[in-house]
Each structure stands twice: as C-alpha cells, then as structure tokens.
C-alpha cells in the first residue's frame, strides 16, 4: 500500500488552486514574472507558477502522510517539556520540523531575495490545511511562520535583512499578545516596555500567558511603551530575538488538546528588544494585521480538522459491520457523513475565497510600497481589503464551529469505540475544541464580521 498523500488524496484542493482569480493573484505577486531573470526557480508565466505551487503542495502532502501523520499519536502522548526556562519539543515534533525545513517549506510567502518562495497566501494556506489534517498541534508551530508577514509589512529594511532570511531558513516565531488580565481585551496589556538610553534599545519586563510556541527564535511582542496610559493607544509592537536572552518559559500549560504545541507562560526580565514600526500603533495597526493572518491560519487548521474527522468517520463506517452489513448503508449514518462532507466542502470554499481576497489586497499593498498605485489599482485594493476584512472572521468563525461539529459526529459514527483513546477521532475532537476559542472566540468573530454588513 502506498503512503497517503494529504494533497493528492483531496481533489478539492487542486480545484481551488485552479480558481480563475489565481491568474490576477500570480500576476500581482510575481510583478508580471520579473524574477525569472534573477532566480532559477522563479516562474516564467502563470502555468509555470501554478505548476510550482502544485509541486510544493505535493511535497507537503507527502511529508504530511509519511512523517507528520504517523508521528501525531506519539506527539499527543509525549508533548513538549519545560527545562531550565526552555522548551524541549516532543521527539516527533522535532522530526516534523526537520522534514519541513529540509524541504524548504519556510518563509513560503516571503520574497526570493530573502530566501523565501514568494508564494501567494492561497497555496501557503493550503499547506497549512494539509499539515493540520495530520497534526493540528504541529500545524501551530509550523504556520506561525506567517508572523513574518507582519514584520515584512511594518519593519524597516534593516530588520528585513536581519530577520526574514532566518525565518526562511527554518527558525520559528511566536506572537506574544495575551496576558493573565488581557485575553480578548488586548487593550489591557501591561507588559512594560522602557527605552534604555545607555544601550540604545528597548527593554521588556513582565509576564505573558498562553503564548503558543513561546520559546520561539523570534517573537513579536505587544507591550505598553507609553508611561501612564491605560488603553490601546499606549501599546507598541516589539521584536524580541531569543539570541539576546531575557525571556524564560516559566511553565507549559497542560491542555485538553493540541498537545504537541507548547503553550507557555513567559517571564521577561529586562529583555532587550527593538521597536517594530511606529510607537502607539502596536494594537490598532500591527496586531490587527497579525490577527487577520492568524485567523486565516485557524480557519485553515479547522478545515484540516474537519477533513480528518470526516476521513476517520467514513473509513470506520465502511469497515464496521452490524446487522450483517457495513453501517454506512444505514440511512442515519450515511446522512451524518453527507452533512459532514457538506460542512467540510462549504467551509473549504469559504476559506479559499477569503485567502484569494487577502492575496489580491496584500499584493497591491506590497506594490504600493514600491511605486504609486494607479487609480484602478487603488480601487481594486480598497475593494479586496474590505472583502478580506469581513470574510476573514467569517471563515474563522464558521470553520471552527464546523470542525467541532464534524469531530463530534465522527465520534458518534464510531459508537462506543469512539470513546476509546486508541481511535484517532478522540484526538481530533480534543484538538478541534480550541479552534472556536483562540485568535478570537466565535462570539468575537461574529462582531468583527457583522461590522461590514450593518
């Protein structure tokens, strides 16, 4: 039996990759394919670009089928450990990361001059979905690479040249936002940032909680830089480099699911850092951009989990016999599977429609940093920015709920066996539960999405 390939096994992915909107996306992202003279691997034209996305997706599908999926159970049981203020990943997690780095699947959306693949967000999001279908916890660690988008958008040239190549080479990232008293209400962040005149740098002091991959190489940190402020306008965003030291992991949380992903409590002791972008725009501008990327990521993770739940339910229903026939032949079971598939397909369609909107507006944003946009381009940019801003919370909210529903139904199809720990459906159920909570609860996504309707 050949190993599963998490890309080629799902024909819907190729269907979404070949959406007509991709032509405009590639044209913008590749600036009319101008890189072809500078880089060997750069595409010559649209067909060439799609072909390269297809190949990378196939490699991702293969690594996922042959390494990440078989490791998922062991990682779920072992989990990461905390020793001397550092995180030690589960052994399977290390294997997964090594495989992804060796295949060059890091900094996927970054320009080629930094060692990136210059992929649009859509094929990158497909990779995130594929990885999450095998191990949602590992999906978190790997897909946090998209924090680099925010550094690319708002950091300066010097920061670009120092940090982006490191992420493209496989270093990991985290976004340090949440605190014990600042969960959904991020304007209450208290982590203190003070300017150190003597050493010409900023210093961070305080605590962050629930930080995914909290011992990452590079952190984007939301902190209070303005003395005496209490609201979001006193917050700025900082880049902390683990090489400088000063941030330790006090503990790793013991969670219901996504065990492979270390969720950390961090202590900052005079940690050296640097400002990203302008002061006072940390929450209102930069974290909003960061969160939109993260929400798209969680939507992809949710679709991956929906797919995994459906796969497990379908396989079991075909295999399990009662009353002399496979249970899939009973209308009640068949009906459940049909509804699961409908939620999966609808959610995936919403996800990639959203990612395409994001792609067009982000590419135009990037072009605007190089030259003045034409009036037509400005119109296009505004149109897609608005669509992306309303669709992103919609995709995250709907897909996270669908993932939970599909995981629940997958266990139901398994009957008593679904309640036993040796079947994968219980891990999928536990992993799915966080998707409707983190990066903004479903209730908050509703508020964010409805703003554009009313």
Residue ranges and their predicted role:
Residues 1-138, 158, 162, 366-375:
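Amphipathic, small/basic residue-rich leader segments at the start of a protein or domain
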Residues 4-15, 19-26, 258, 379-454:
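Alpha-helix capping/hinge segments and adjacent helical runs
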Residues 38-41, 243-246, 250, 262-294, ...:
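A glycine-rich, basic-preceded beta-loop-alpha segment at the flavin cofactor/substrate interface
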Residues 143-144, 155-191, 200, 355, ...:
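Internal maturation/activation junctions in enzymes
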Residues 295-376:
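Extended amphipathic alpha-helical segments enriched in small hydrophobics
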């Amino acid at each position: 039996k050949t190993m599963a390939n998490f890309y080629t096994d799902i024909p819907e992915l190729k269907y979404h990759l070949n959406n007509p909107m991709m032509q405009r996306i590639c044209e913008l992202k590749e600036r009319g394919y101008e890189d072809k003279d500078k880089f060997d691997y750069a595409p010559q034209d649209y067909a060439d670009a799609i072909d390269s996305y297809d190949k990378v997706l196939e490699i991702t599908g293969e690594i996922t089928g042959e390494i990440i999926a078989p490791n998922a159970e062991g990682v779920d049981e072992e989990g990461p450990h905390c020793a001397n203020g550092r995180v030690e990943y589960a052994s399977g997690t290390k294997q997964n990361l090594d495989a992804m780095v060796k295949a060059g699947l890091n900094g996927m959306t970054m320009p080629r001059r930094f060692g990136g693949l210059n992929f649009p967000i859509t094929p990158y999001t497909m990779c995130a979905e594929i990885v999450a279908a095998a191990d949602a916890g590992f999906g978190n660690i790997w897909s946090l690479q998209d924090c680099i988008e925010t550094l690319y958008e708002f950091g300066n040239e010097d920061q670009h040249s120092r940090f982006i190549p490191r992420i493209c080479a496989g270093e990991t990232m985290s976004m340090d936002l949440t605190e014990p008293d600042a969960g959904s209400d991020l304007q209450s962040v208290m982590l203190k940032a003070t300017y150190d005149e003597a050493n010409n740098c900023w210093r961070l002091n305080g605590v962050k909680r629930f930080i995914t991959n909290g011992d990452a190489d590079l952190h984007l940190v939301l902190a209070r830089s303005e003395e005496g402020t209490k609201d979001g306008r006193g917050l700025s965003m900082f880049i902390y480099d683990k090489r400088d030291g000063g941030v330790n992991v006090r503990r790793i949380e013991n969670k219901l699911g996504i065990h492979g992903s270390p969720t950390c409590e961090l202590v900052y002791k005079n940690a050296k850092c640097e400002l990203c972008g302008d002061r006072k725009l940390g929450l209102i501008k930069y974290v909003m951009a960061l969160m939109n990327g993260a929400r798209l990521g969680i939507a992809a993770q949710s679709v991956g989990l929906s797919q995994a739940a459906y796969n497990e339910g379908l396989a079991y229903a075909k295999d399990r016999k009662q009353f002399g026939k496979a249970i899939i032949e009973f209308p009640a079971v068949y009906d459940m599977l049909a509804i699961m598939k409908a939620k999966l397909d609808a959610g995936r369609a919403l996800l990639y429609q959203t990612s395409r909107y994001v792609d067009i507006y982000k590419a135009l944003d990037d072009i605007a940093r190089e030259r003045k946009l034409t009036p037509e381009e400005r119109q296009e940019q505004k149109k897609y920015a608005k669509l992306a801003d309303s669709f992103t919370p919609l995709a995250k909210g709907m897909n996270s709920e669908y993932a939970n529903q599909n995981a629940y139904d997958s266990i139901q199809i398994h009957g008593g066996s679904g309640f036993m720990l040796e079947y994968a459906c219980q891990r999928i159920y536990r992993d799915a539960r966080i998707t409707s909570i983190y990066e903004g609860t479903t209730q908050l996504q509703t508020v964010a999405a409805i703003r554009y309707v009313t």
